[in-house]
């Protein structure tokens, strides 16, 4: 399809009109980017991009991530014009309750939206994750005769995105990994929300990205479709082996003369000038107007794209016939792993005391072998988090099939990249660091939970038992604060077998992220209790580890490394004491009322909780009469056992609390 500049220019102005009308109707939203990047949208969606609006999950589609998610009407307008299932009525419901056009793009809610974005810079990390996943897919599934994967990943980012630390971490890693399938369009309009960008930035962005290892092209005429296309085609076909940054010099809110090029053009301030702007753009007074010419153009373009899809589908069918084992492996990406099958590949543990981080490593190896699409990364801590997949190789520019990813000391980029992997959907991502550093990637964890992404976090060194490193490295509030994130399953296993259950629980969950909080110090394997009961009990979040002898008098509840302390205390207390292990409050809370009553009968008011962390969240489980043994202060630097004793995380404390009723 030849380049039809007149049709694309008309479509750009009509997309501007849709943006203005939607924001005006909602009395809320951001006009700046949808108007400032309209020609970019026309170039990509109207000519250069490979997609199929009827098959939005096409495996080999080009990926578009709107990192500057506040400009969501840019994306909705182009999805509508391109023929995705985003209707004009959907556009009219922009930012309204239960609409498919929310204020910021949300994955799964809107066909064609590839990532949940809004917190600036996250989309850059997501794009990097997508790009690595695409490279890995090529390495794992392409053959000499059938190259079924060769797509590009395009990110649209603004000044705010590139100022954020997560984007800087991700960009540095993208250059290091030579991700030549990644193209970042930088909407360089020299404006931020508060003021002109020069008031908060003065670096040379082009030189910064060249230093990262990018090839950089600047398009001074950012509203010239021919120049944009030239830059995109250059980036797409470059043989430099580098990721690409295209700096697009644009005018924010172009079309609304009164606010264009100023920070007032960022939000909805220009709405009161929409009528004049519509006239200046050559649009009729009719709201939400799309001309027949634009409809016809995109229908013809859609037919062209569908021919490309049909050609690929033929290639894909031939690939499946020629490579049944690879086809089965690819199909497995859409199948939720069966917990019983996963348990069957994990060997039973010996009785020797080991840390749950080491138990995690022992569990991870057979599971990773059984699940060839499972990948594991670490923020420069594989040697401590022990989540390296033996024999799977490192992902490098020369080994793009490697399943271990070295993120470097870039926790935030790791979090955003893991989300990108999960959005991609073929590989099952996991990443590791120390639990106390989870705060460095919390925004990405939150977005994973919001987007229902099956990311697995392996966070070790989970309590004050870290010891000598002191309070900067001793998480006390961290586990509880993470439990507050909706749809995040935080599992803190108490021994080897519970660790096996935790990994299986994580891998068999596909509706959201799972966080495994593992300890540094050695723990006894509670081998006096049934192996399967411990493994499978984790799947329910909480279970009776040790049933009382005789009439029930006291319930002791515990998690993680304090579970053995609870068992020791129960032994000393004697008859009538029940020990409940609760590695996951999230899972336990989802159990039927009958099960929860069976584990924690309401008739028993005498309850004690022990966990080496802050106490407030435990009140719902002990009630007004219960006792909580925890740590409502920061830790201290000393050997781990000394710290635990000093802060009262002991069997003596549990016994004293139980006897105080």
UniProtKB/Swiss-Prot annotation:
Catalytic residues as annotated in Swiss-Prot or TrEMBL: 411
Coiled coil regions in record: none
Site (Important for catalytic activity): 30, 266
Disordered: region residues: 99-118
Catalytic activity: D-sedoheptulose 7-phosphate + D-glyceraldehyde 3-phosphate = aldehydo-D-ribose 5-phosphate + D-xylulose 5-phosphate
Signal peptide: none
The keyword tRNA-binding is assigned to this record: no
Keyword annotations from UniProtKB, A to Z: Calcium, Magnesium, Metal-binding, Thiamine pyrophosphate, Transferase
Recorded GO MF terms: metal ion binding; transketolase activity
Cofactor: Mg(2+); Ca(2+); Mn(2+); Co(2+)
Known function: Catalyzes the transfer of a two-carbon ketol group from a ketose donor to an aldose acceptor, via a covalent intermediate with the cofactor thiamine pyrophosphate.
Name by which UniProt lists this protein: Transketolase
Recorded name of the encoding gene: tkt
